[in-house]
Design a protein with these regions (language model features):
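N-terminal targeting signals for export/organelle localization
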Residues: 1-56, 175
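Local sequence-structure signature of Cys/Sec-based thiol-disulfide redox active-site neighborhoods
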Residues: 56, 68-103
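Thiol-based oxidoreductase modules, predominantly thioredoxin-like and allied folds used
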Residues: 63, 83, 106-120
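Structural recognition of the beta-strand scaffold that forms the well-ordered cores
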Residues: 80-82, 110-111, 131-134
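Extracytoplasmic/secreted cell-surface and envelope-processing proteins
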Residues: 91-92, 119-122, 143-144
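Structural micro-motif
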Residues: 124-136
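Non-catalytic, surface beta->alpha helical segment in thiol-disulfide oxidoreductase systems
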Residues: 133-175
Length: 175
C-alpha cells in the first residue's frame, strides 16, 4: 500500500511539473508573438534582435514606416528623417545626442530603421548609417552622412554641426 501511494504522488508531481512547463512555454511564446506598435504591428519576435533591444528606449520612439515616409514625400512635405540601423554602433552613439537636440528645437525627427526596412537603402540612396536627411516639398534638399565625431577623431560631426543643420531648416518643417 505504501508503494502504491508513492507511485501515485510521483505521478501527481510529474503531471504537475509538465503542466507548469507547458504554462511557462505558452506564456513565453505568447510574449514573443506580441505586436510592436512602433513597427506597424510586426511581431516582436520577427524583428532583428538589435531592434528588439531598442523598443523601449526613449530615443527610438519616432519610427516612421516606409508607407508613412512615402506619403510625406508624395504630399510634398518638409521634414527630417534620421536613417539608422538598429545594430549600427555609430547610430547608437549619435541617437541619444541627436534626439534631445531635435526635441529642444521643437522638431519631429522621424527615424527610419534600415535594419527592418532594407528597401530604404536603395529608395533613398543611403550608403552609410547614420544619415540625417532634410526633405523640402517632398524632395531631398540636404543630408549629413555620419554620426557624432568620436573624441580624438577627425571623422564625423560635432553637436554644433547637428544643431546648425537643424536650425537651418527648422522654420520650414511641417509636422
Amino acid at each position: 500500500m505504501n508503494r502504491k501511494k508513492k507511485n501515485k504522488y510521483t505521478a501527481l508531481y510529474a503531471f504537475g511539473g509538465v503542466f507548469v512547463l507547458l504554462v511557462a512555454a505558452l506564456v513565453f511564446l505568447n510574449g514573443q508573438g506580441e505586436a510592436s506598435d512602433l513597427y506597424g504591428g510586426k511581431k516582436v519576435s520577427s524583428l532583428n534582435p538589435a531592434t528588439q533591444e531598442l523598443l523601449n528606449d526613449p530615443n527610438y520612439q519616432q519610427i516612421i514606416l516606409p508607407d508613412q515616409l512615402k506619403s510625406k514625400v508624395d504630399n510634398k512635405e518638409n521634414f527630417f528623417v534620421y536613417f539608422f540601423a538598429s545594430d549600427c554602433p555609430h547610430c547608437r552613439a549619435t541617437t541619444p545626442e541627436l534626439m534631445p537636440l531635435a526635441d529642444d528645437a521643437g522638431i519631429t525627427m522621424h527615424q527610419y530603421n534600415l535594419r527592418e526596412y532594407q528597401e530604404g537603402w536603395r529608395e533613398y540612396n543611403i550608403e552609410f548609417t547614420p544619415t540625417l536627411v532634410y526633405f523640402e516639398n517632398g524632395v531631398e534638399k540636404e543630408r549629413m552622412v555620419g554620426g557624432l565625431k568620436p573624441e580624438g577623431s577627425s571623422e564625423g560631426y560635432s553637436i554644433d554641426d547637428f544643431k546648425q543643420f537643424l536650425a537651418k531648416y527648422k522654420g520650414s518643417v511641417t509636422k
